[in-house]
A protein has these predicted regions:
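N-terminal accessory targeting/assembly segments
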Residues: 1-150
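Glycine-rich, often acidic-flanked micro-motifs
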Residues: 3-45, 56, 221-238, 249-250, ...
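Gly-rich Lys/Arg/Thr-decorated short loops/hinges at beta-loop-alpha junctions or inter-strand turns
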Residues: 73-79, 182-187, 393-399
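Short helix/loop capping segments that flank catalytic or ligand/cofactor-binding pockets
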Residues: 118-121, 167-169, 198-201, 244-245, ...
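Charged, amphipathic alpha-helical linker segments immediately N-terminal to NTP-binding catalytic cores
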Residues: 165-212
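ATP-binding Walker
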Residues: 241
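A conserved segment at the C-terminal end of the G1
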Residues: 245-255
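Generic C-terminus detector
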Residues: 489, 494-540
């Protein structure tokens, strides 16, 4: 039986005059699953996971994400299409309407943390309309120790009510769904959408503002692992670059898979989260056993469907969305490190799937190149062939997570540069998991085994003993040899039958980098700009 006084105490700072008649506080996973089943929010799979649908929205809605523009944010936030301003008074009225809506509902309240390092940890309070959303928060945020006093005043709170829809004409939203962050009130309002990832990414956005702005701590959209010797590695990469696959290593402990912070000086890195939110489209036990085995009682699978006549999930089924996901606590992974903190990274990997076949499969970056490529956040995607479009499409996402950055990308890039200066033993690598021997359509995808071998070589330190040469256009340092990898694939130009075509394609890709960077030119330092490619013909 929930202590209504304890609930009322927790809800008062969030604007609730009194607790709703049916309010649940910090229910354990089994009780939340029970509530979700009772309320018809989901069904159990044959492995015991809770399968739930997110409704009309099967992903984030970036055009409906807002930040309140006030004295706290006006001069700090990078305003534009990503960080859309919202009126403070309208936020206050929207907040009141949501509280009134939830006052008549059965609600679920949870206390949690964000950030595994005590120096920057946020105390969270989450109010959800749905039981399975509360289970999502249990899985994804950091969990207080059993018996801990969590009657705190939260550092940030979330109110999430998918059943509450805004009136755009009155409330200042674009449409009925919304996610609005108010840094002064320390509150996120989410309504009209059942996509649970809005809560996770809402707090990520909060940390991406607070940590660099107030704690001199670099926030990063990356995965991280650590070796037996305590050597930490972090992996950046957009969708399709192999970030999850390459950062998952049975010989290395998992720190986290998506969101991390890097404390100043020798402070090291830490996970923001307490769980994993992994894509499961076409999931198989053979390809990703770690994720497969984590989908059990206590886990959530979103927007999936059963094999007809069974309770077995058909992971190939895309009838709802390709963005099918699972959410589970990090301790469901056998080699998870808890607490999720580690030392200063020894190696940093920027992953790109270059479908133009231009970038080396592995190259070392100096500080300027590291900052430039960090700000560029490049990969290339192959367009669908159903319309006859086969040309690769460049994708640039600043800091490998542009849509989550409240501050200007140069802020994060300069912080990375400062960290590299303060920690000169850190090595930054650019890894091309894309094409070799030609662009998409002519060449072929780099073998995963080779990429793994190259990363293992970088982690072991063996590459410090080989000769490097400078790429004539991108300026990165290319190793002449990697143990276990054919040396002829290390220089991308030598893998092309038509050398002139390589030179032309490399120059064209370099021009796309430069064109993308034009919007940052007035803000970027000379140090960052020094990492730009040089557009020039390579001698035959």
């Amino acid at each position: 039986m929930t202590d209504q006084k304890a609930v009322a105490t927790r809800l008062a700072p969030l604007g609730f005059a009194q607790a709703p008649a049916h309010a649940h506080l910090n229910l354990p996973p089994a009780a939340l699953v029970e509530q979700a089943l009772r309320r018809g929010e989901g069904v159990l799979t044959d492995t015991g996971a809770l399968m739930a649908d997110t409704g009309a929205f099967t992903g984030r809605s970036p055009k409906d994400r807002f930040i309140v523009r006030d004295a706290t944010t006006n001069d700090a936030v990078w305003w534009g299409d990503i960080n859309i301003p919202f009126d403070a008074d309208k936020f206050g009225k929207l907040h009141q309407k949501m509280v009134a809506y939830l006052a008549e509902k059965e609600i679920f309240v949870r206390d949690a943390y964000a950030g595994a390092h005590p120096a920057t940890q946020l105390k969270l309070r989450v109010v959800t309309e749905l039981a399975w959303h509360n289970l999502f928060c249990y899985n994804m945020f950091l969990r207080p120790e059993t018996g801990a006093d969590t009657s705190w005043l939260p550092d940030f709170s979330i109110i999430c009510a998918p059943g509450f829809e805004a009136d755009p004409a009155v409330d200042g939203t674009r449409q009925k769904n919304f996610a609005v962050i108010d840094f002064t009130r320390k509150l996120i309002l989410i309504g009209g959408t059942g996509y649970a990832g809005e809560m996770k990414k809402g707090i990520f956005g909060v940390l991406n503002f607070l940590l660099p702005h107030q704690h001199d701590t670099l926030s990063m959209h990356c995965s991280a692992n650590v070796g037996a010797a305590g050597d930490t590695a972090i992996f950046f990469g957009l969708s399709g670059t192999g970030k999850t696959t390459l950062s998952t290593d049975p010989n290395r402990g998992r720190i986290g898979d998506d969101e991390h912070g890097w404390l100043p000086g020798e402070g090291g890195i830490f996970n923001f989260e307490g769980g994993c939110y992994a894509k499961v489209i076409d999931l198989s036990a053979a390809k990703e056993p770690e994720i497969w085995n984590a989908i059990r009682f206590g886990s959530i699978v979103e927007n999936t469907r059963f094999v007809p006549g069974t309770h077995t999930v058909d992971y190939a089924n895309k009838s709802v969305t390709e963005n099918t996901r699972t959410a589970y606590p990090i301790y469901f992974i056998p080699n998870a490190i808890e607490p999720s903190v580690a030392g200063v990274p020894k190696n940093i990997f920027f992953l790109t799937a270059d479908a133009f076949g231009v970038l080396p499969p592995i190259s070392r970056l100096d500080k300027s190149h590291a900052m430039y490529h960090f700000m560029s956040g490049y990969t290339a995607k192959v367009a669908g062939t159903e319309m006859g479009i086969t040309e690769p499409q460049t994708t640039f996402s600043a800091c490998f997570g542009q849509v989550f950055l409240p501050l200007h990308p140069t802020k994060y890039a300069e912080m990375l540069g400062h960290q590299l200066e303060a920690n000169p033993d850190v090595t930054v690598w650019l890894i091309n998991t894309g094409w070799t021997g030609g662009a998409y359509g002519t060449g072929h995808r780099m073998k995963l085994a080779y990429t793994r071998t190259m990363i293992t070589a970088a982690l072991s330190g063996v590459l410090s003993e080989v000769q490097f040469k400078t790429h004539p256009i991108f300026g990165v340092a290319v190793p002449g040899a990697v143990p276990g990898v054919p040396s002829e694939i290390l220089d991308p130009r030598t893998t092309w039958a038509d050398k002139a075509a390589y030179d032309q394609t490399a120059s064209e890709l370099a021009e796309r980098f430069i064109k993308n960077f034009e919007k940052y030119a007035d803000f970027a330092s000379a140090d960052i700009l020094a990492g730009a490619p040089r557009v020039a013909a390579v001698p035959a």
